[in-house]
């Protein structure tokens, strides 16, 4: 993840062109999206850090951008159970990590934004 120069600075990236091995401590962007050809697109962007996994010799990602997804843009009828579960799990993590640092008003907003789908 870049600063000032380019949003996608190397050395590492998750792409077909990526030829640099990931190492613990590297920060990347996770950008799943959908694009309707010739019309519109939507993308969710979170920053992730590479961390050692509990299983020796493996790596995993930890999301470090903690912001709820805008529920107004989610059509639950288009999601399968695993996708709903992922969003609910993500929102629980966002709430648990952020709410201790917020004012009562902000905490109330976050609780509503992070409620299960």
Model-derived segments and spans:
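Charged, cofactor-coupling segments
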Residues: 3-117
């Amino acid at each position: 993840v870049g600063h000032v120069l380019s949003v996608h600075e190397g050395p590492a990236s998750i792409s077909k062109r990526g030829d640099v091995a990931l190492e613990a401590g590297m920060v990347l962007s996770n950008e799943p999206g959908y694009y309707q050809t010739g019309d519109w697109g939507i993308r969710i962007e979170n920053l992730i850090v590479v961390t050692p996994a509990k299983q020796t010799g493996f790596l995993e990602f930890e999301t470090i951008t903690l912001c709820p997804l805008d529920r107004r843009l989610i059509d639950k009828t288009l999601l399968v159970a695993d996708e709903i579960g992922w969003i609910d799990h993500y929102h629980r993590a966002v709430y648990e990590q952020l709410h201790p640092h917020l004012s009562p008003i902000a905490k109330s907003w976050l609780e509503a934004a992070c409620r299960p789908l």
